[in-house]
Amino acid sequence: MSIISIAVDAMGGDFAPEAVIGGLDFALTNLLDNKDVSFNIYGQESQVLPMLDKYKNVKEHSLFIDTPDIVLANDKPSFALRKRKSSSMWCAIESIKNGVTSGVVSSGNTGALMAISCFVLGTLPNIKRPAICCALPSKCERYFVILDLGANVDCSANSLFQFAIMGNAFAKAVLNVPNPKVALLNVGEEEVKGTDVIREAFLLLRQAESSINFCGYIEPINMLGGEVDVVVADGFCGNVVLKVAESIAYIFKSVFEKSVSSSIITKIAGLLLKSSMKRNFMKFNPKIYNGAMLVGLNGVVVKSHGNADKIAFAHAVKVAVNAARNNINAKIIHELG
């Protein structure tokens, strides 16, 4: 098996570079085959080298490239395009274009990541606006695809239509669903509900039913029920829904832990249920679903949460490695026709 080389933006995210380099170590130790993965790490020497000295395993499997600049969390995309060409994010993305790496992962500024990726890599044929896409678990022991998760806050009906096409292709390529059920996220299932843009997108998808299995609207309350394979939303709604779902998982865990420690009886019950609850919570643990692919780009770009710790970042790295190894982009291009 050939070696997969992944570019890593070591300076992106709230806890960089510690969470990034620590995440690479966790990925190498627990999630990946060390023998066929290497990393090109882009960042500031003064901050990254001490981390590499701390994590010897990462140092052995990586090449460090010193980059003088950083894309800041409050940088506007236009500013990043003009002024951040020497940043760790830019150089990491550019390594894909130059054929040095097969994918990139970053916890940095989402808008800047999208803008730089579009500028440097370009988009796939007939795709105007890439979207952030990931696979999430449902209660039915199956996964579903949701997009957009924050790349495009304000979308036209045609953009939502393209997201549906890309999500459909992603579900076929990644989840191996032969005929994905696609739905638009809305406040109700009736055709009259929603904004003008949502209703227009509904009509576009209804007209394309010969090429896409469109199932109409889906409400957030039914999103995790396993009824559909692809959920389409604008970046604002998609991002809000994702973060609410993640917070509910953490709240449920916290409430359960408090409940089982309230008395002797509940503590005993908690011990009896501990392994089962832990196993079930892990299915919905947001950390293991960190890492969303920017679909529609001419290259594998994976966005990690800005507040990701090392475990969460490690799972984003796994997403990038698997996407590159399985040549996901080629499969999506094939599905797009």
UniProtKB/Swiss-Prot annotation:
Q: Which reaction does it catalyse?
A: a fatty acyl-[ACP] + phosphate = an acyl phosphate + holo-[ACP]
Q: What is its EC number?
A: 2.3.1.274
Q: Which GO terms describe its cellular component?
A: cytoplasm
Tell me one GO molecular function of this protein. phosphate:acyl-[acyl carrier protein] acyltransferase activity
Could you tell me the keywords of this UniProt record?
A: Cytoplasm, Lipid biosynthesis, Lipid metabolism, Phospholipid biosynthesis, Phospholipid metabolism, Transferase
Pathway field of the UniProt record reads: Lipid metabolism; phospholipid metabolism
Q: Which InterPro entries match?
A: FA_synthesis, Phospholipid_synth_PlsX-like
Per UniProt, subcellular location reads as: Cytoplasm
- Which is an annotated Pfam family here? FA_synthesis
GO biological processes: fatty acid biosynthetic process; phospholipid biosynthetic process
Could you say which enzyme class this protein belongs to? transferase
Q: Which NCBIfam families match?
A: plsX
The record's similarity note reads:
Belongs to the PlsX family.
Q: Tell me, in a sentence or two, what this protein's role is.
A: Catalyzes the reversible formation of acyl-phosphate (acyl-PO(4)) from acyl-[acyl-carrier-protein] (acyl-ACP). This enzyme utilizes acyl-ACP as fatty acyl donor, but not acyl-CoA.
Query: What is the protein's quaternary organization?
Result: Homodimer. Probably interacts with PlsY.
Q: Per its record, how is this protein called by name?
A: Phosphate acyltransferase
Which classification does the entry list for the species?
Answer: Bacteria, Pseudomonadati, Pseudomonadota, Alphaproteobacteria, Rickettsiales
Gene from which the chain derives: plsX
